[in-house]
Amino acid sequence: MSMSWTRKGRIFDPAAHDWARSHAQVPTPLLYDDKVRIFYADRFEDGRSYTTFVDLDRKDLGKVIYEHKAPILGFGAPGTFDDDGVMPSFALRRDGQVWLYYSGWNRGVTVPYRNSVGIAVSDDDGTTFRRLYEGPVLERCPEEPYIAVTPTILRERDPDGRDLWRMWYISGLRWTLVEGKYEPVYVIKYCHSADGVTWARPNHLCIPQSHDNEAFSHPTVVRHRGQYLMWYCCRDSADYRDGAGAYRIGFASSPDGLDWTRQDDVLGLDVSGEGWESTMTSYPSVIEIDGRVVMFYNGNGFGRTGFGYAILEDQRD
């Protein structure tokens, strides 16, 4: 298999807007008739992430037509799983509502933070949100004791015709000490649900690490030409903050969404020689828009330089 992506450039740079803060991290698309809404995470001065959005012209994805200048969801109550940060991950429509699966953040003591998955619901087509529950729908568990976060979801049918929600998410393996600081190591796992809320977790590893300190983040999965295609980002546990071990976008394919063949070398979308994506490519989100396969993604600094997009021009099996 080979792929040919055309970079279309940066869409949104938070540094160019006086109301924005420091980041436009984890671009998360939702389609409308005439626009594409991109939820993303900015950060307050104290480093806590919050979620807001911009709207893009559906016919010209490089054109921002609306900028939302406030958080769409506040922090959780003290002691809850998201009292220190709210970061988008996947948006979908359900029963006249918009559901936003998001990553909640707690600051840690022995390690820097803990992450879990929550659901926020919008009754006004994706402008304001409320929590479906005060607690997480995906959390640490006996077999996965560290992190469960950044889901992507496909809604399908099981062999009996019943609803089947399929999720790919990040699961922590451990925290490893690097130059006196604990860094998280995590992989991509799979779970499923009948209702999108309660998840059966078979502890199924999707992609083995290439080395013990490799960490994955933000899988995005689509069905295309009879296959499941997954993009993600991966990094080392050392020197990964825009250094030699920084995030790069990777790729894998699967016949069933469970067992994956890693094919990073066919992706055809590495860092550029200079500019906003010169040291890092990260947090891909792939979606089909009007017959085109489009990837929204971050560049340097985990979204500090904003987000852009690329279009898949050719895929050969």
Which role fits each region the language model picked out?
Residues M1-D84, L92-T150, L154-E214, R223-E277, ...:
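Beta-rich carbohydrate-recognition and catalytic domains
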Residues S217-H218:
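Alpha-helical scaffolding within the catalytic cores
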Residues S285:
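Conserved active-site neighborhood of enzyme catalytic/cofactor-binding cores
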